[in-house]
């Protein structure tokens, strides 16, 4: 996938770079696998903001993605490679030999006409899905389950990849995309290979309007607010925050304070925390 950069025709195109979408084949999605969705826009059932900086954006149709990959022993053929507005990764329309069609995440290197298989005996080829116990050490994987049968939850974003680094007993040790080392049951399914669209992080929006198209609203710094609106606010002119440590708008410590619960059930499964933690 290539990245197209713009010349500085306007201030908005000076730093703008977008995907060329050269691998996109299908324009309209499969109608039976799409449905409308009401986006919450950061509001709860009473219409009160519970998550700031969300709202607006272009209307989207949700594509139903097969994260479980539970069509065991049935060969599927890649029919199309499509754009999905709900994620950075591309998606593939797969038609199985029994006639059913499903969307899957596009693994890197997959082309139209390639065949994929979900089976315990499937070969170690990009796009195939099998249990971790049947994969050799060092295999790079994506769409990894945390609980057997629940569906893939790890390494689903564009360009992400996890790796099997060890196996012992009923558990396998994975190196996560964040750098964290975590234990996962060897019964969990995973898909071989890396998620496609690896250059997604190299795109630059270039202007504020592009972020509004994505449904993201402006983030105002607390230091420029009034003292009544934020603990960092107030003062004469450009003033420091006036506190020992940064605080949230509601007075809680932030920017460095760990927010993960201390006694979470999965704490014993994490061998090494992520790199930037």
UniProtKB/Swiss-Prot annotation:
<dbReference type="InterPro" id="IPR014726">
    <property type="entry name" value="Ribosomal_uL2_dom3"/>
</dbReference>
<dbReference type="InterPro" id="IPR022669">
    <property type="entry name" value="Ribosomal_uL2_C"/>
</dbReference>
<dbReference type="Pfam" id="PF03947">
    <property type="entry name" value="Ribosomal_L2_C"/>
</dbReference>
<feature type="region of interest" description="Disordered">
    <location>
        <begin position="35"/>
        <end position="57"/>
    </location>
</feature>
<dbReference type="Pfam" id="PF00181">
    <property type="entry name" value="Ribosomal_L2"/>
</dbReference>
<dbReference type="GO" id="GO:0003735">
    <property type="term" value="F:structural constituent of ribosome"/>
</dbReference>
<dbReference type="InterPro" id="IPR005880">
    <property type="entry name" value="Ribosomal_uL2_bac/org-type"/>
</dbReference>
<dbReference type="GO" id="GO:0019843">
    <property type="term" value="F:rRNA binding"/>
</dbReference>
<keyword id="KW-0689">Ribosomal protein</keyword>
<comment type="subunit">
    <text>Part of the 50S ribosomal subunit.</text>
</comment>
<dbReference type="InterPro" id="IPR002171">
    <property type="entry name" value="Ribosomal_uL2"/>
</dbReference>
<dbReference type="GO" id="GO:0032543">
    <property type="term" value="P:mitochondrial translation"/>
</dbReference>
<dbReference type="GO" id="GO:0009507">
    <property type="term" value="C:chloroplast"/>
</dbReference>
<dbReference type="InterPro" id="IPR022666">
    <property type="entry name" value="Ribosomal_uL2_RNA-bd_dom"/>
</dbReference>
<keyword id="KW-0150">Chloroplast</keyword>
<keyword id="KW-0934">Plastid</keyword>
<protein>
    <recommendedName>
        <fullName>Large ribosomal subunit protein uL2c</fullName>
    </recommendedName>
</protein>
<dbReference type="GO" id="GO:0016740">
    <property type="term" value="F:transferase activity"/>
</dbReference>
<dbReference type="InterPro" id="IPR012340">
    <property type="entry name" value="NA-bd_OB-fold"/>
</dbReference>
<dbReference type="InterPro" id="IPR008991">
    <property type="entry name" value="Translation_prot_SH3-like_sf"/>
</dbReference>
<comment type="similarity">
    <text>Belongs to the universal ribosomal protein uL2 family.</text>
</comment>
<keyword id="KW-0687">Ribonucleoprotein</keyword>
<dbReference type="InterPro" id="IPR022671">
    <property type="entry name" value="Ribosomal_uL2_CS"/>
</dbReference>
<feature type="region of interest" description="Disordered">
    <location>
        <begin position="226"/>
        <end position="262"/>
    </location>
</feature>
<dbReference type="InterPro" id="IPR014722">
    <property type="entry name" value="Rib_uL2_dom2"/>
</dbReference>
<dbReference type="GO" id="GO:0005762">
    <property type="term" value="C:mitochondrial large ribosomal subunit"/>
</dbReference>
């Amino acid at each position: 996938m290539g990245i197209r950069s713009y010349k500085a025709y306007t201030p908005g195109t000076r730093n703008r770079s977008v995907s060329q979408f050269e691998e996109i084949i299908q324009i309209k999605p499969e109608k039976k696998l799409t449905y409308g969705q009401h986006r919450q826009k950061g509001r709860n059932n009473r219409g009160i903001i519970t998550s700031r900086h969300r709202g607006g954006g272009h209307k989207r149709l949700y594509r139903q993605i097969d994260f479980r990959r539970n069509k065991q022993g049935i060969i599927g053929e890649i029919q199309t490679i499509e754009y999905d507005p709900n994620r950075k990764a591309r998606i593939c329309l797969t038609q199985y030999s029994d006639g059913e069609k499903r969307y899957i995440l596009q693994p890197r290197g997959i082309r139209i006409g390639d065949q994929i298989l979900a089976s315990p005996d499937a070969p170690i080829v990009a796009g195939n899905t099998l249990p971790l116990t049947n994969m050799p050490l060092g295999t790079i994987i994506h769409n990894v389950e945390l609980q057997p049968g629940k569906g893939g939850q790890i390494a689903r974003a564009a360009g992400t990849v996890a790796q099997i680094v060890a196996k012992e007993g009923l558990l396998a040790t994975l190196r996560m995309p964040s750098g964290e080392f975590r234990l996962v049951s060897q019964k969990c399914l995973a898909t071989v290979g890396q998620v496609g669209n690896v250059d997604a992080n190299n795109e630059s929006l270039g202007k504020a309007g592009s972020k509004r198209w994505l449904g993201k609203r402006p983030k105002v710094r607390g230091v420029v607010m009034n003292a009544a609106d934020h603990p960092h606010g107030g003062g004469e002119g450009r003033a420091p925050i006036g506190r020992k440590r940064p605080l949230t708008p509601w007075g809680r410590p932030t920017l460095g304070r760990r927010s993960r619960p201390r006694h979470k059930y999965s704490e014993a499964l994490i061998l090494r925390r992520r790199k930037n933690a």
